[in-house]
Amino acid sequence: MSGTGRLEQNKMIVRRLVYEVMNAGGLDIIDEIYAPKLANAARNWISPFLASFPDTHMEIVDLIAEGDTVVGRFKCSGTHLGEWRGHAATGRRFTRVDEVGIFRIEDGRIAQAWSLEDTLRRMDQLGLR
């Protein structure tokens, strides 16, 4: 596969994470897009988040690939309908909270992932700070 083809394939894996898992709640897809050593950890983070914010919607703002790394900038929105970080559901909505994810792709799956998010903005919008 050409270098450009590999980069597009790597970006498609992150797109699947956003569209099929985070936006559509497809937890069963986690094993397809995460390496076996990371799949359970991803599920253990994503599942409770989606339970707390079942209408989660992530927008891809930027998606950049180089080598085996994909970096994404996202805007995330959702309604707080379940316990999150020890806080009871508020029923309030957060909108367009900035997030950045860095993903290392190995053998067509996410092998490592790091993320940063504007948690304070999310908490402010939910009335939790």
Question: Which residues does each PLM region occupy?
Answer:
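C-terminal and inter-domain tail/linker signature
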Residues: 1-129
